[in-house]
């Protein structure tokens, strides 16, 4: 399969105080989130001057990706400028015929896969006649470079705390009902599998997997245990040092720099615990090489590069022009 461009498709984030509330309204539109909840979350962004780190990280990653392969790279977001609809129109006007779409999410699931597929379909519709074919690349939670980057980050974090620190992986929680529609529990199983692969690569025989940043009504069940509850339990059991690895995030979203670096670290300090947070891939050259390798899998018809371990978990395959991924996990999520 030939490509003449790459589209980096991401979540988006505000880049100034005046953009915070409109951005959050975009993210939560149609979900019935009360205004006071938006006000609360807005304070997290305003703590950093109203600037999410994600757009700057993605621009740096794009420069790395341009150096790692020979195709032009475009940038589009779901929830803030540059909006993917506008970017695809530019691609159309530039004569792009088929582009590989690399998303900043490693997983299957609605918000991590299906919603990006919907973004692609919506953007092509907005572009109309002459819109390029858009091929979303597969999830990459088991790619060798994904495992290598997080294993290396854990080693770096371990150097900052005493030997024997407890290794705790964390990822974004989702409603249990949403997770169970996929396979079942495809998202949570993928995260657990990737955590096992990374822990083994980093030389850890034991680790914990917890969830973070849940939202929504308290009566709705979300994936547990929550990271704050787990840290409290560790402290009560006598644990004095932890390494927190945000394996669910490939970049420093606000859920990383606020929920972990600010809130969780303060909780650890108040409990007398040392905490080291493993870095995310962000704009590492290896992350760009991972994206380039996914592109080459389709360009050259290569067998996907995967790290294998006990009880492997399936993932979606490439999706073309917003069609449901195969196997039909994302289709089940979209229609469930």
Swiss-Prot record:
Transmembrane segments: none annotated. Fe-coproporphyrin III binds at residues 52, 116. It is an enzyme of class 4 (lyase). It catalyses: Fe-coproporphyrin III + 2 H(+) = coproporphyrin III + Fe(2+). Its EC number is 4.99.1.9. GO terms for cellular component: cytoplasm. CDD domains: Ferrochelatase_C, Ferrochelatase_N. Pathway: Porphyrin-containing compound metabolism; protoheme biosynthesis. GO terms for molecular function: ferrochelatase activity; metal ion binding. Keywords: Cytoplasm, Heme biosynthesis, Iron, Lyase, Metal-binding, Porphyrin biosynthesis. Fe(2+) binds at residues 172, 255. Pfam families: Ferrochelatase (PF00762). Coiled coil: none annotated. It comes from the Bacteria. One of its GO terms (biological process) is heme biosynthetic process. It is found in: Cytoplasm. Involved in coproporphyrin-dependent heme b biosynthesis. Catalyzes the insertion of ferrous iron into coproporphyrin III to form Fe-coproporphyrin III. Belongs to the ferrochelatase family. This is Coproporphyrin III ferrochelatase. The gene is cpfC.
């Amino acid at each position: 399969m030939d490509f003449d461009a790459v589209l980096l498709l991401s979540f988006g984030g505000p880049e100034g105080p005046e953009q915070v509330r409109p951005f959050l309204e975009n993210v939560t539109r149609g979900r019935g989130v009360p205004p006071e909840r938006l006000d609360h979350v807005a304070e997290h962004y305003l703590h950093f001057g109203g600037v999410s780190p994600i757009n700057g990280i993605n621009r740096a990653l794009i420069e790395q990706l341009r150096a790692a392969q020979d195709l032009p790279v475009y940038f589009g977001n779901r929830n803030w400028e540059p909006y993917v609809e506008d970017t695809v129109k530019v691609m159309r006007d530039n004569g792009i015929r088929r582009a590989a779409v690399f998303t900043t999410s490693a997983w299957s699931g609605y918000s991590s896969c299906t919603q990006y597929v919907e973004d692609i379909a919506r953007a092509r519709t907005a572009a109309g006649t002459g819109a390029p074919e858009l091929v979303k690349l597969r999830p990459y939670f088991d790619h060798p470079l994904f495992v290598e980057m997080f294993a290396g980050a854990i080693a770096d974090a371990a150097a900052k705390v005493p030997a024997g620190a407890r290794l705790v992986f964390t990822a974004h929680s989702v409603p249990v009902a949403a997770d169970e529609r996929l396979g079942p529990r495809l998202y949570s199983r993928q995260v657990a599998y990737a955590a096992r692969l990374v822990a083994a690569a980093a030389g850890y025989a034991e680790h914990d997997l917890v969830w973070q940043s849940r939202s929504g009504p308290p009566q709705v069940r979300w994936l547990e245990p929550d990271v704050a509850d787990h840290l409290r339990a560790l402290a009560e059991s006598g644990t004095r040092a932890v390494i927190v690895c945000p394996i669910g995030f490939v970049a420093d979203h606000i859920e990383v720099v606020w929920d972990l670096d600010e809130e969780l670290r303060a909780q650890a300090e108040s409990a007398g615990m040392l905490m080291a947070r493993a870095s995310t891939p962000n704009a590492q050259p290896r992350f760009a090489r991972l994206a380039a390798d996914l592109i080459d899998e389709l360009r050259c018809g290569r067998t996907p590069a995967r790290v294998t371990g006990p009880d492997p978990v399936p993932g979606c395959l490439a999706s073309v022009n917003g069609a449901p991924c195969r196997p039909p996990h994302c289709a089940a999520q979209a229609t469930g």
